């Protein structure tokens, strides 16, 4: 049983074979639960629709930093309403992205802070997108008291110091495809160091496919390859890692089955 804590199965890349991808993940790779993440008004809607269709798929709703420029003040009320949906178990993804120059940094920060405040109001954990913005992400999480709700730094790309700062605020560390890349020294180091009770597995599919599918469309079933790599790095059976990380996901997102 594996919990893939970050998917985008509503992405157009899956329009031709979405049901088959989900079936394959369940039956061939042992993925029992998936958290599908919406990141703007369009993808939030389709993410919830997908979660309503499958009892083992949940949804997160939020505004991605690269889409922050599209955020309107009325969207906060929209997110607040959706936070009460029974299949919505987290807010996000939210955060900062300094790699893609699509939204000004000050706009990203404003939208990020608004979502953290909403998460504290509705008491849902948050999913953090952090690209080339580690220090600013941690600073905002600290200043906005994100420790009150916790969450996950998805597709974690920071170093040990950033990891420790996140752990101090009740956050989990999400690891995906990059940990399988041959020269990915830092992700492999983090995979060894993160405490077992704070580790989550993810794919970010259709993006960031693990080896040997790097550069191709990622699938949620490939989270099994991520689990195998991390289990090898930590020197434990993959079944044990799957159990540990699934328990962690259930605890963070308050999912009971």
Cite the ranges covered by each PLM segment.
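Mid-domain alpha/beta scaffold segments of enzyme catalytic cores
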Residues: 1-257
């Amino acid at each position: 049983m594996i919990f893939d804590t970050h998917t985008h199965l509503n992405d157009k890349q899956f329009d031709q074979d979405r049901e088959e991808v989900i079936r394959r993940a369940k039956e061939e790779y042992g993925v029992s639960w998936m958290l599908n993440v919406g990141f703007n008004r369009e993808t939030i809607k389709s993410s919830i629709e997908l979660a309503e269709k499958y009892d083992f798929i949940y949804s997160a709703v939020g505004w991605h930093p690269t889409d922050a420029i599209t955020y309107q003040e009325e969207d906060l009320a929209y997110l607040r309403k959706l936070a009460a949906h029974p299949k919505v178990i987290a807010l996000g993804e939210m955060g900062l992205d300094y790699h893609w120059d699509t939204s000004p940094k000050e706009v990203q920060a404003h939208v990020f802070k608004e979502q953290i405040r909403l998460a504290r109001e509705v008491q849902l954990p948050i999913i953090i997108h952090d690209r080339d913005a580690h220090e600013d992400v941690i600073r905002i999480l600290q200043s906005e008291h994100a420790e009150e709700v916790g969450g996950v730094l998805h597709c974690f790309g920071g170093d040990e110091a950033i990891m420790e700062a996140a752990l101090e605020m009740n956050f989990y560390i999400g690891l995906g495809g990059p940990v399988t890349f041959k020269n990915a020294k830092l992700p492999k180091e983090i995979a060894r160091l993160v405490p077992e009770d704070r580790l989550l597995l993810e794919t970010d599919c259709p993006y960031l496919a693990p080896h040997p599918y790097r550069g191709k469309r990622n699938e949620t079933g490939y989270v099994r390859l991520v689990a195998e790599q991390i289990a090898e790095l930590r020197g434990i059976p993959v079944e044990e890692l799957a159990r540990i990380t699934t328990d962690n996901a259930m605890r963070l997102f308050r999912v009971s089955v």
